[in-house]
């Protein structure tokens, strides 16, 4: 069974074709600059160098058409015809309260995804364009929607309701939704499998740390709490996002700087985080380099980032009533030896003991805890595409 996984952005598209017999990625690719001058596809067949396909792509339909043509191309293709593709799994960022699991796409589901546009105005329209383009080009192929928010729908009300007038929740569905759900679910399941513990009491804190970062508190495979909120702006300090702050700061800055709501939102989403503090970059690698070279603001940015992660870990340990495993994943979580060490330092009171030698790995599934550590510290590479493919396969079987 071959599953095509599609992740559509506003001007980009990532894809993978996975043979589910042995979970083998046959091909992966990235389409860039859709609807912009200089559009191109970087198409990478397993065991071969990447091929660059440079063609004009005015919209997502044309982009997907070229991707499908590349998949059956006699030189760099991997299937003889579209009939070999059993189903398509689409990443959808926001499923609101309606979708608490992955679903087969039909008219009712499409209407539900469109209703969530208000909650994810940057992402859901792009996801919808990808789905509609695929449906037009592959009308007989089953399609599945896998939602970033679905995994977090098991949170109890006390963890998702904001202390605002309740009517805003009733009228506008303003509440915590959380994101990166597919990644949190993948690594928590992998942790359970690695430690051979699938009990209803297995307590995991998953740290998805990248340019966008979030934590989740998970008990018995179900999400209890997560750090992102109504939008991906809440929670941890990120590449360019502020994370948690005093809400009264917003009107204060808006008055001082004469900013509109949109301009203020742009400051919080695009100019803040470690980029705002350091003034160096939004890329943690650049900031780590600058800090090593003696840049004090770069060092401060890293200190603030790690301190916030530690605070959340301790808070989630309290919510779960203890913790069995602490998982690091995504770009920083999988690859930054120094930041993992910095985050774990000071968590010894929780039973977290990181082994400095075992921690010297990048992007490899590793138990990096000391033998004496009560809490297992795991580094687990995330694989959202595989999770999407697994959900898709389960629904079309």
From Swiss-Prot:
Residues engaged in binding ATP: 14, 208-212, 283-285, 331-335
Lineage top rank: taxon: Bacteria
Catalytic reactions of this protein: acetate + ATP = acetyl phosphate + ADP
Co-factor note (free text): Mg(2+). Can also accept Mn(2+).
InterPro entries per record: Ac/propionate_kinase, Aliphatic_acid_kin_short-chain, Aliphatic_acid_kinase_CS, ATPase_NBD
Family membership: Belongs to the acetokinase family.
Name under which the protein is recorded: Acetate kinase
Species, as recorded: Treponema denticola (strain ATCC 35405 / DSM 14222 / CIP 103919 / JCM 8153 / KCTC 15104)
Gene that this polypeptide is encoded by: ackA
């Amino acid at each position: 069974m071959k599953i095509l996984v599609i992740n559509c952005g506003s001007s980009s598209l990532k894809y993978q074709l996975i043979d589910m017999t042995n979970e083998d990625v046959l091909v992966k690719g990235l389409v860039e600059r859709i609807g912009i001058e200089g559009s191109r596809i970087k198409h990478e067949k397993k065991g071969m160098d990447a091929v660059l396909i440079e063609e004009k792509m005015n919209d997502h339909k044309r982009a997907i058409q070229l991707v499908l043509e590349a998949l059956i191309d006699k030189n760099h293709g991997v299937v003889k015809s579209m009939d070999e593709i059993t189903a398509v799994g689409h990443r959808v960022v926001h499923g609101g309260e309606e979708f608490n699991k992955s679903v087969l796409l039909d008219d009712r589901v499409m209407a539900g995804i469109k209703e969530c546009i208000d909650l994810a105005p940057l992402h859901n329209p792009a996801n919808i364009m990808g789905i509609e383009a695929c449906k037009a080009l592959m009308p007989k192929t089953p399609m599945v929607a896998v939602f970033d928010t679905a995994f977090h729908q098991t949170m109890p009300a006390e963890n998702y309701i904001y202390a605002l007038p309740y009517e805003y929740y009733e009228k506008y569905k303003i509440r915590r939704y959380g994101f990166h759900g597919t990644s949190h679910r993948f690594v928590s399941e992998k942790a359970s499998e690695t430690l051979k513990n699938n009990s209803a009491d297995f307590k995991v804190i998953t740290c998805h740390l990248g340019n966008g970062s979030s934590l989740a508190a998970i008990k018995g495979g179900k999400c209890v709490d997560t750090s992102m909120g109504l939008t991906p702006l809440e929670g941890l300090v990120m590449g360019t996002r502020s994370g948690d702050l005093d809400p009264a700061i917003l009107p204060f800055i808006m008055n001082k700087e004469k900013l509109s709501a949109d301009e203020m939102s742009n400051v919080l989403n695009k100019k803040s985080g470690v980029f705002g503090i350091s003034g160096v970059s939004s890329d943690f690698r650049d900031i780590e380099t600058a800090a090593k070279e003696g840049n004090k603001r770069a060092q401060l940015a890293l200190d603030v980032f790690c301190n916030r992660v530690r605070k959340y870990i301790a808070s989630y340990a309290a919510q779960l009533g203890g913790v069995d495993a602490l998982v690091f994943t995504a770009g920083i979580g999988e690859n930054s030896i120094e930041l993992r060490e910095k985050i774990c330092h000071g968590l010894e009171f929780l039973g977290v003991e990181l082994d400095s030698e075992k921690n010297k790995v990048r992007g490899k599934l590793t138990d990096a805890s000391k033998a004496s550590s009560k809490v297992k510290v795991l580094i687990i590479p995330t694989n959202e595409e595989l999770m999407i493919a697994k959900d898709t396969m389960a629904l079309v079987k």
